[in-house]
Every structure is written in structure tokens, then in C-alpha cells.
């Protein structure tokens, strides 16, 4: 392993909850997912991950993993994104990842429209838009502690702070 590669590995180990062996296994998994050998995973390749293709939030997951917004996921983004799903990841870090799912425009806040869009992805056609909007409005009213019409991370955390969120954000990829 070259100096650059070992520095990347070191950074990944520091920035995630994965050890060297887990990162190596995930690298092999990444290479299998990268069907065209481009060194990145595109949306179609991402959707072949078990548990992702059937997830109603698959498109949002892709966007959150794709930190630089270029439409593909490189190995570092893959590892960083998967780290949120590790059983070793703290509840706080899992909540930060969940917050990113809702924060579509990446401005550090969840607005009414963003909450509606993500919840619509989850409920699909099971609720009429009017019913869903009522739920979104009620959620925003209850969670928006400072009354600015949007949720910051602290408000989001307080609204969803429960063991079920952390356990729901655990995925066995290794």
C-alpha cells in the first residue's frame, strides 16, 4: 500500500467507526458494486445494494452519501455514508445522518417543504397530500422551539430522540 493509500485508510479509520479489516471488506464490496469500473458508484449501481433498492428514501440516501453533489459516490463517500449505519456509530451521529436525509438543500435546517417531501417518499400514496400536510404542519409546530418556521438540528434531535431511531439506522453491510 502506497503512502497516499495508507493516509486515506488512516483518515477513513479516524473519520468512521470501521477498522482496517472492515474498510478492506467494504472496498471489495465497493468494487463489486462499481460494475463499470469507473471508481465511483452511480445511482443504478447504488440501487443494487440490498436494502437500498426497496427503501423509499433511496434517492435521498444517494444524495446524502454523495457529499460533493457530483451524482456519483466515490469510495471515501461510500465509507463515510455507511459509517452512519454501523452498529458502533453513536446515536448522535445516526441522528446527524437522519437530519441530512431531511435537509434536502443542505442549509442546516429542515423546512416545512423538505419535511413534506421526505415524508411523502415514506408514505407514498397511503395518505392524501392534505392529510400529510396536516401531519407536517403539526410536527413543525410541536418541534420548532424557536418559532422560526424551520427545524435546526437541536430541534430535530429533540423531536426524534428515541432508541428506535438509532436502531432503525443500523445496516449490516460487512
Curated annotation (Swiss-Prot):
Domain EF-hand, by residue range, is 21-56, 60-88, 90-125, 131-166
GO terms (BP aspect): regulation of cell morphogenesis
User: Which Gene Ontology terms cover its molecular function?
Assistant: calcium ion binding; phosphatase activator activity
Spell out the SUPFAM superfamilies in the cross-references. EF-hand
**Keywords carried by this UniProt record:** Calcium, Metal-binding, Repeat
- The residues the record assigns to binding Ca(2+) 4 are 144, 146, 148, 150, 155
Matching Pfam families = EF-hand_7 (PF13499)
Subunit and partners? Composed of a catalytic subunit (A) and a regulatory subunit (B).
Q: What is this protein called?
A: Calcineurin subunit B
Organism the protein comes from: Debaryomyces hansenii (strain ATCC 36239 / CBS 767 / BCRC 21394 / JCM 1990 / NBRC 0083 / IGC 2968) (Yeast)
Q: Which gene encodes it?
A: CNB1
